[in-house]
Each structure stands twice: as structure tokens, then as C-alpha cells.
């Protein structure tokens, strides 16, 4: 062993962290869905390269963190280092925290574990902490890793590059079996606990291969531990796998029972300070958009609506019948709620008056190769994908067969009917957003027969109606759009003036009706019975009315309930039964002659009875008039 004339204070290589982007991706996911506003300490773990696998590039001890750092199960093939994560909720808190005080608090935890240790368990001596702030909106993550170290000064009395081959062989055997980082050597064996009365030869397995033979700073807590046990002079063998192990004779310079705590990680410039991981430029833009859309929704669960079920909303397959003003606004609102599957059905083309009222269309959409506007359904789906590429949006050009409009091309209309039936089977929710009354009849009937969630939105000039349809097995069944009618819907589109052909409404009404329709759906989905929920049923997210009627002339809104009607032309048991039995044949008869529909539903009989009652009432009133006239004539003689 070569001696130095001057004693040298023992020096170390400071730990560095390597935090992969997957660590922050996992942290953001857990922050949103699990931790929320909870800033309690979270148990995590990092890992280091096994000493037998180090190479010349591993000149610094590195702690690795990735998405697996949050797992409960550990990878036994790696050296797992326990740690704790302290995630604060604001950047102001991150900046204003007293970092020295925080480090001292962590250091006291390490001090307690080290001084009470019964063995050289590396997990007790190497615990780390990480202070973080997650800016989930900008995908920026501020972090600062600390390795609390108990300061104690040792001087190198002498040093040699020669080591006892017996010790190195024992170390290599030990590493093949079970990882340990620090041992006491006596009696020809390596021991995992300290014995002050035995030979003071200790072995440290280094986690870096620095060229100047400075060991990792992980050694410092072990040295403090043996000093705490009263050992003041040792021979230390620092093992390295590249045949560059070395031996030093160390002497304790001074010992204090209240050690100074150090350990904040330095930046790449060698300065004390936190680091910033900006993942915004690294994440795929589509993935960024997906996460950003879900961000606002998941933030609801932090405080405002912790019990809301967002997943059931997201997985709904929604069919929009009508891709005009109502359809455009409903689609945008559904996107905002996280719905990912939307299908538009419409047969119309985009006209020059549409883009200002229908937000899914632009001026350029008013042109196509045929000289007409683009098809609304197709362009609505395309433009919705431009708003959010992650949506599964489809457009289908289809004219819904309408009651009271006789069949002129049976092959085409039957094909449209069959397509519509198939679409109902494939979707969970149907919105009726068309601009005529009779066009809603067939979808109402198919929805009732299939017991789907059907939501209807309709506009007047300065009023609107939003309602949900009842289902057949519902207690106190809710009525549908036609349950208040005593006649079947008929042709309302022919022989109209210009102001009747255009949808003449106050522009704001469409936004209000559309948003209420979507919010009504969300409320339904939060109820355990879904569309079986009664009128004004309560959920953790509010009430579920049957109907909402709004009036813009006095800015009033009313919740209403109307029960189903046994003779309804769209949802009565007799009509549904006939539809299930005959299918297209029944529909064709109704399209050709709305009187047939009235006969089947019983409305004809209701009308006849009403006429008889009215006739009887008139006769009764006429008789009363005759009697009163006689009394007036007799009164002249009695006066």
C-alpha cells in the first residue's frame, strides 16, 4: 500500500437522475385520475444498473426513473431503489417551498432509518425523494431530485490499487446470488451487519466507474453508520467490475450526532436548482390532442363532480339524424364531453346560408364538382375530424322515409329504411335533429321498438323543445314527440312559401337547444337505470327532466312531464307490434296513407268519438238556449 505524505479528505461522485418521458406520462395520468389534489407523499422506486454490467461510460452513479417507477411489483433483474414523490399543486408552491427545510426533514427520516438499521440494507441507505409540479395543460414538468446524505468527514490515510483477491471473489459470488452494496469482511466471509469488535475491513460495491477513483456518494451514509457505531478507522475496499478496484485506509476526522444534511441534485451546469421536462414537443400531436380533450373532463372529478362516470359517456356510439344547425352544435358538444363515435345522417347539401349558422361548415363547402354544395353528412364528418382527429366520425347520405309522403321509388326508400334500421342497431343513442315534423316519425318508431335512448330537439321561431323518449318497459312511461297529437303526422313540406321553406328561428335558440340535448344525455347516463329513469329523477350530477321547453321572448325555461299515449301514432303498443311483425310493409302503408296509421293506432276512433262528443255538446247547448228563451218570454207575463 502506497502512503501519501499529506492526508486527503475523502471525495465522492454525486448521484444524477435520468428521468424518462414515460415517468411523466404516467405521473400525469395518475395525477388526473387518482391523486387529483392530494399532495401526500407517494411511494415510488427507481433503479440502477447492476455493478457487473457497468462499462466505461458509466462514470457517474445514475438513478433511472420511468413509468414502472409507480408499479407495486418490482423487477428483480434490476437494483431497485425506494423513494418518495412529493407532487405539489401549483408552481407558486413549488417555487416558495423552503428547499433547505424540506431536505432537512427528509434527511431526518434517513437519519432515523440509518441509525436504527440492523444490517447494511442498501434500500435504507439510498432512499431518494423527488419534488415535482405537473403543468398538465402545457405538458411541462418541474422536478428536483434529492438524495439525503448524512455528512461525515473521513480522510484517506493511504491508498492502493491492489485488493485482496479473496474479497473480490467473494463479492462476485455474492452479486451472482443477491445484491448487497456494503459488507464487513472478517473471518474470510462477507457480513451484512456491523460488528465493532471484529476486523474493521469493509467492502463497498461502487455504482460508477469514475476515472479518478472517486466512489459514488451513496457510500457516505454507510460511513456515517459505522461511525455512529463507534468505528473511527477502517480499511475500505471499493469494488469495481473492470479490475480497477482499489483499497483505502480511512480515518474519521470528526463525528457529530447532528450531521449536516446535503443531497439536492445539481443541474448539468453544476448549479443547485430544479430541472424542467417539456414534453409538449416530444409527444405525438394526436396524442397531445387526445390528452388535452380529456384534461378538462377529468378535472371535473377533482372537486366539482368526483362521482361522474366519464367512461360511459366516452364509449357511447351516437347517431345524429340531421347534420344542419342542431346537428352541428350537438356534435361539437358531444366532442366536448369526450364522445368518440358520431355518425351523421342527412340527405341535404350545403347552401350559402348554412355556414353562418352551422359551425361544421365553411364557405368553401358551398361548392362541389357538381356545381352544388357538398353533402352535409359527409362534410360534417370530415370537418369534425379536423376539429379533433381522434373522433370516429362517419357521414351517410340518406333521406329518411316520411309518413304522409307516398312512396315513389320503393327500391330506394326500402333501402334507406333498411340502412336506418341497421344504424339504430349499431348505435346506443339517437338524436332527432331534423327540420320537419313528419321526418321524425320513423326514427321515433324504430327507437321505441329497439328501446334506444332517443333525444329530440326542435326549434320554433323564439322557442325550443328538448325531450327524451320513454321506453316500453318503463314504469310511468314517458311520452314521445307525438304523444300529445290526436292526428298522425302528415305532409307539411309541400305548398310552402319561402319563409316557410327556410328555418326561420332566432339564431341563439339552436345553441341553447343543442347544449340542453347533450346535457340531458349526460344526465341520463349518470342514472343507474339510464333511459328507464323517471321524470325529474335525481342523480349525483343533477336531475333528469322529461321535457325542457324554452322561450326566448321572455327568457323562460320550464321542465314538463307528459305520459305516453296509448293511441300514439309512433310509440303506442299496437303500432310497435305491427312494426315488429311487418317491418317495411307496415312502414310503406303508413308512408302512402297516414289515415292507415291513424286506424292502426286508434286515433281514427278517438277522432270519431271526439266528433260525437262535440256534436252532443252542441246539441246540449242548443237545447239550453231554447229553454232559456222560453223563460224570457214567460217572464213578461209574470212581471
UniProtKB/Swiss-Prot annotation:
Gene3D superfamilies for the chain: NAD(P)-binding Rossmann-like Domain, Ubiquitin-like modifier-activating enzyme ATG7 C-terminal domain, Ubiquitin-like modifier-activating enzyme ATG7 N-terminal domain
Mention one GO molecular function: identical protein binding
Q: Does the keyword Metal-binding apply?
A: no
Active-site positions on this chain: 502
Q: Which GO terms describe its biological process?
A: autophagosome assembly; cellular response to nitrogen starvation; cytoplasm to vacuole targeting by the Cvt pathway; mitophagy; piecemeal microautophagy of the nucleus; protein modification by small protein conjugation
Q: Where in the cell is it found?
A: Cytoplasm; Preautophagosomal structure
Sequence motif GXGXXG motif, residues: 322-327
Task: Offer one Pfam family short name for this entry.
Answer: ThiF
One GO cellular-component annotation of the UniProt record comes to: cytoplasm
Arranged from A to Z, the UniProt key words for this protein are: Autophagy, Cytoplasm, Protein transport, Transport, Ubl conjugation pathway
> Per the record, what about its domains?
The GxGxxG motif is important for the function, possibly through binding with ATP.
Q: What does this protein do?
A: E1-like activating enzyme involved in the 2 ubiquitin-like systems required for cytoplasm to vacuole transport (Cvt) and autophagy. Activates ATG12 for its conjugation with ATG5 and ATG8 for its conjugation with phosphatidylethanolamine. Both systems are needed for the ATG8 association to Cvt vesicles and autophagosomes membranes. Autophagy is essential for maintenance of amino acid levels and protein synthesis under nitrogen starvation.
| Entry's family note | Belongs to the ATG7 family.
Complexes and interactors = Homodimer.
Question: Protein name, please?
Answer: Ubiquitin-like modifier-activating enzyme ATG7
